[in-house]
Amino acid sequence: MNGVWSKERAWEWYNSRTWLRGCNFMGSDCANRIDQWQELGFEQRLETANRELALAAETGFNSIRIILEFLVWDKEHDGFMQRLDRYLDTAWKHGISAMIVFGNDCMPPKNEFWKPLQLGEQKYDWGYHGGRKFSQHQQFGGMGYHVMDDPAVFARHEQWVREIISTYKNDPRVIIWDLYNEPGNSHRESVTMPHVRRFFEIAREIAPIQPVTSALWRNIASPDQDEINTFLLENSDIISYHSYGTYEQNIRLIKLLKSHGRPVINTEWLARMTHNTVEQMFPLFYLEKIGCWNWGFVAGLYQTYEPWNGVWQQWEQGGARDVDFKVWFHDLYRFNLHPYDPNEIALIRKYCRLADEDHALGL
């Protein structure tokens, strides 16, 4: 595919800025991404986001990863575009850039529990990761259903990606284009490959000033045996990956991914329950200069401090015996904006400060 940045250009872009660090962000009063982007309740939720983004900046973060919602763009187009711009403005005034994500393969199958997404008041269940009792965060036998599998609907998704990248292709408020979240997840495997390929083609046609990527998230240790991983490694300007694995596992992954000669970032991490902790991972990312975005910020309606429903299923079936159920899974702050663990926040602030000092010295 034409247009992939040279390694030299990727490193020039990466080294021209301080260490990128932040979180996957959704305001604590959002039940899901429809809540985050739809007109209903947006003014109040933007106030919440403003308050929490100020806290993110105070913590030392300089970037957020945000996943867009196609349905809102499709049904409330003009309003969505205005709201997205206001969201970017709100983050930017706190010195925070945004990584924008389009596609997402974390989808439940179309079974008896499946319901189509709708605008309006969003229901949620307490005590469940993602705020729903039946969600994509549990184990299913069938393939996850995506509306993009309908060619007519996919054509609209192409327009969505094209319009937003074209609108912000020269905008410093957008730091990275993360075109597809976890392609192949939910047993979708190669079904997703045409969608991923097309999103990359669109981005290359537009040629934004920001790098283009999509994260490896499984089989990373043997990427040549995975069609999607091979494509992502060959077509991403900077290499991104997800890992909720241990410190030792991440050391091996970082070494492997760095061998490709491009900057490496981690766009999803932090799983205290499975021993992926702030105390170990954040200093590692600093030392290796791996840009990093942990999952979650302020605990809220989306409830990602709870374990994935699939972890409970494993435990009930006799597995997951190494999981520490006494600690939060994701998120850094409590509902009242106090830290989940003040020691974590102190450590984050320390390494953010060190990174900025390094950059000022040209290190």
Spans of model-derived segments:
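Active-site mouth of glycoside hydrolases
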Residues: M1-S236, H242, Y247, S259-H260, ...
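C-terminal beta-signal and adjacent terminal beta-strands/loops
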Residues: Q303-E306
